[in-house]
Structures are given as structure tokens and as C-alpha cells.
């Protein structure tokens, strides 16, 4: 009988994993920590409201057989030092807790962003491809920093199985973050001359892959992505969106202004991933025995369907009917101002003719 600890246990993927573990007779107990209460409760789950930076998690993890580290700030924060403190120093604290607990397995979810978005990326990216995350994108920088931290920790703890899953962009009905909200914009901003394909990992496959990691010995890094990729044009077609194309220099300048002013959800470094492809190969994990049930198109379709009827502009998200009413109100005000201006011009012209 095993005891599994999970950080970030209140997230949807973690909850799906807990549900899977709940049904496994070999799992006796699940220890979950998060700063937010989980939406669902499970018989085997012992929940602790803790930040991953809290030193008390070492006591909570005592006696666990495996730790799944999912807690990580995805949506970029204006306070980048705080974001790094949670993501990197929080992970360092988790590793300390794993060491003290006697756990023999650690599963960590990294991301395709750790490879970076570069014009000379391998196609496809394999686990042997260099990690060159764009350091002007805090989320990517932290994923890379944590991977390097894990590599060093693994060297000092060779008896612990350390699994690093590099997820593709996770999409599905329950995903709600700055990436998914990009597709809720009335128009999709694009860099002129660039149309990179993308991969989307379905949330259900993401959860199932974590269960697979717990029930198999997978030491090292694994790309976790479906077989297919989607072209930029097909994404626009499926989403029913049109683009606003801007030159690269203009796009980065506007993104920097918007981010510094607190109007945008992500820093300018995100734009690199809208320019250069970061397409991964899943050969290694498939050869290990994992089977994907969903394609990139499935993940995209589910995300779009779940969020249909919503519009996001910068940091503001609203129902589509509210957006349209505000647009119509602005149009009405604009027409009224324009009409008033024209009437005044006409009145002045008539007055001058009388003179």
C-alpha cells in the first residue's frame, strides 16, 4: 500500500489524478497541499492548506512513497520576484521535504517552454534537444531554472526516481489561463511573416500521464504531447478568428508598453512562442507504454467549446453580450459626436452664406 503526496492538489488536473488514485486499491492515502481548498473531497485525501514555501510540508510529507509536484504559478505576475520565489524557491523547499520524507519517487511537470522558441529549434524537439528557454518570459525562465535544479538534486539523490514531464500547451474544458484567453480575443494578434504550428495536450491525457508516471519507473525527462500539431491557419479557422498582423518591432514595443502598464496578462517574451515553432516528439513516452486518447484538435475544440460566449481584451474578460453592448454603446457615442460635429459645420456654413 502506498501514500502519494501532491502539491497544487486543488487544480483540475490534480483533482483528476486524485480521482484516479482514489479508485486504485494499491493506494492507501493521498496527502494534498494547496493554498486553495479543493473543489471535491475524496475519502483517501488528507488536505492541508499550505504554501509550497512553508517548511512544515516536510512534516506533512513524512512517510510518503511518491511526490507529484504540480504547484506552479502559470499566469505571469507583475511582481516577478514573488513569482520566482514561489516557483523556484518553492520547488527547492519541496525537494527538501522529499528528501526528509524518504520518498522514492518524484514527478514534476515541466513544459515545452523550457526548450525555448528559437528560429533554429530542432524539429521535432526530443528530450536530448538543448533547453534554451526565453529568459524574457518569466514562466519559461522558471521552468528551465527548476529543471536545472532537479538535475543537480537527482545527481545528489541517485536512488530517487525523478520523472520530468515536459507538457505541451494543456487545453480542455476546464483550462482557464492567459493562454486560453488569447483565443477569446475579438482578433488574434500575430507577428507579420510568422505562422508557427502548435501542439495542445488534452487535460485528461495530462492527468492520465501523471498516473502512468506513478505506476511505472520513468527516470529522466519525457515529452508529453499528442502525435499531431495544428497549423496557425487551422487554429484560426477552428476558432473562427481573424488576425491583426503587426511587424515584429511594433508587436514587441506594444507588448512591453501594455505589460508595464498592467494592461496585458503576459510579458513581451511570450511573443517568441507566436513566432517560432516548439513542436515536440512523443516517441520516448509512447515507447514506454503510454497511450494518448486525444489529439491536439480534440483539446483545442474542447477548450473553445467550454469558453464560447466569452470575450477577453487584455486583462478584462466578459460575456460576449456585455462586450457587444459596450461596443454598440461606443459606436453610438461615436456616431453622436460625429453627427454633432457635422451639424455644427453645416450650421456654420449656412450662416456664412447668409452673410
Regions found by a protein language model. Give the residues of each.
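N-terminal Rossmann NAD(P)H-binding glycine-rich loop of SDR-like oxidoreductase domains
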Residues: 4-23
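NAD(P)H-binding glycine-rich loop region in Rossmannoid oxidoreductase-like domains
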Residues: 39, 45, 49-89, 97, ...
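Conserved Rossmann-fold NAD(P)-dependent oxidoreductase catalytic core, especially the SDR/UDP-sugar
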Residues: 93-138
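Active-site Tyr-X1-5-Lys
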Residues: 135-163
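NAD(P)-dependent short-chain dehydrogenase/reductase
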Residues: 153-203
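Conserved C-terminal active-site "lid" loop/helix of NAD(P)H-dependent oxidoreductases
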Residues: 203, 233-234, 262-291
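Mid/C-terminal beta-alpha module of Rossmann-like enzyme folds, strongest
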Residues: 207-268, 310-318, 345-355
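Amphipathic terminal alpha-helices
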Residues: 296-355
Amino acid at each position: 500500500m502506498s501514500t502519494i503526496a501532491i502539491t497544487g492538489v486543488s487544480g483540475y488536473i490534480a483533482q483528476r489524478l486524485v480521482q484516479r488514485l482514489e479508485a486504485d486499491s494499491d493506494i492507501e492515502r493521498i496527502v494534498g497541499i494547496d493554498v486553495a481548498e479543493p473543489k471535491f473531497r475524496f475519502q483517501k485525501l488528507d488536505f492541508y492548506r499550505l504554501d509550497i514555501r512553508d517548511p512544515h510540508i516536510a512534516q506533512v510529507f513524512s512517510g510518503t512513497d511518491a511526490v507529484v509536484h504540480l504547484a506552479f504559478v502559470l499566469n505571469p505576475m507583475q511582481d516577478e520576484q514573488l513569482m520566482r520565489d514561489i516557483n523556484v524557491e518553492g520547488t527547492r523547499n519541496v525537494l527538501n521535504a522529499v528528501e526528509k520524507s524518504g520518498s522514492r519517487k518524484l514527478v514534476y511537470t515541466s513544459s515545452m517552454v523550457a526548450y525555448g522558441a528559437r528560429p533554429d529549434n530542432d524539429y521535432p524537439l526530443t528530450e536530448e534537444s538543448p533547453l534554451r528557454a526565453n529568459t524574457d518570459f518569466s514562466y519559461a525562465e522558471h521552468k528551465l531554472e527548476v529543471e536545472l535544479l532537479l538535475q543537480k538534486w537527482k545527481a545528489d539523490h541517485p536512488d530517487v526516481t525523478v520523472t520530468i514531464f515536459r507538457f505541451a500547451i494543456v487545453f480542455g474544458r476546464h483550462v482557464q489561463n492567459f493562454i486560453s484567453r488569447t483565443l477569446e480575443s475579438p482578433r488574434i494578434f500575430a507577428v507579420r511573416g510568422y505562422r508557427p504550428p502548435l501542439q495542445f495536450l488534452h487535460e485528461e491525457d495530462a492527468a492520465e500521464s501523471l498516473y502512468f508516471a506513478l505506476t511505472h519507473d520513468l527516470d529522466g525527462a519525457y515529452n508529453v504531447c499528442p502525435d499531431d500539431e495544428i497549423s496557425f491557419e487551422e487554429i484560426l479557422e477552428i476558432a473562427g478568428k481573424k488576425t491583426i498582423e503587426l511587424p515584429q518591432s511594433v508587436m514587441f514595443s506594444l507588448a512591453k508598453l501594455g505589460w508595464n502598464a498592467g494592461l496585458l496578462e503576459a510579458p513581451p517574451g511570450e511573443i517568441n512562442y507566436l513566432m517560432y515553432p516548439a513542436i515536440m516528439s512523443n516517441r520516448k513516452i509512447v515507447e514506454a507504454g503510454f497511450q494518448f486518447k486525444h489529439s491536439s484538435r480534440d483539446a483545442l475544440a474542447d477548450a473553445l467549446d467550454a469558453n464560447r460566449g466569452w470575450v477577453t481584451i487584455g486583462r478584462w474578460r466578459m460575456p460576449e453580450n456585455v462586450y457587444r453592448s459596450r461596443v454598440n454603446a461606443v459606436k453610438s457615442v461615436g456616431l453622436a459626436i460625429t453627427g454633432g460635429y457635422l451639424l455644427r459645420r453645416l450650421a456654420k456654413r449656412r450662416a456664412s452664406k447668409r452673410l
